[in-house]
Amino acid sequence: IFGVNTFAHRFPHLLFALISVYSVYKLARHLSDKTTAKLAALMLATSQAFVLAITDARMETPLSAGIIFGLWQMILYIDNKKAINLFLAALGTAVAFSTKGWLGPVIIFLTVFFYILLNRKWEIFSLFKTWMFIPVFFLLISPVLYAYYIQFDLHPEKVIRGKSGHSGIRFILWGQLFERAGGFDVKERHSSYFFLYHTFLWSFFPWSVFAYTAL
């Protein structure tokens, strides 16, 4: 639409960033008061890593949008039991999956589980439409699975990291999360055990001190 240029490359990431900030505000407003919602949106929008992801057009921008939007809609569904919120939750979760595999959906599912646990809303699982989330989710990610299939499964001759015979389906459904979590692709890096702690200092700057104080 906009041609091949920097604006066309970064504009979608700006839209995803706006979705993230708006979803954070709406979710916080649903769970708390207006002041808290404004502060939550402000902290996300001005954090160092979030701004960097937009300017560099990184995959973390649509990942964040999918997670936050999907979580917001899932919480709304649990509280209001409206089918439209369930569908939008599946859409957000599918967007998150499309970026980095199961990482996004796992974050959403774990958060929702503890929300249900703390609020004792187990009755949501007795509704038939709740379970419709599963087929809708897989329907929405089917284009992504197909894209990985035609790029890799149909071309086993492709050499990646010195190896051929890669399966795109296996990568997005398994390797993207589980192999990375197990460190199978970073065995030689010997990362510090405190990596996430000191990385959070700059990534959530200037709010990292407040976050650590809250912990």
Feature annotation, model-predicted:
Residues 11-31, 69:
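Transmembrane-helix motifs of polytopic, lipid-linked glycan transferases
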Residues 13, 49-62:
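Short acidic/glycine- and proline-prone juxtamembrane loop motifs at membrane-interface regions
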Residues 30-31, 35, 70-88:
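Membrane-interface transmembrane helices that cradle and orient dolichyl/undecaprenyl
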Residues 52, 85-100:
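Membrane-interface alpha helices of multi-pass inner-membrane proteins
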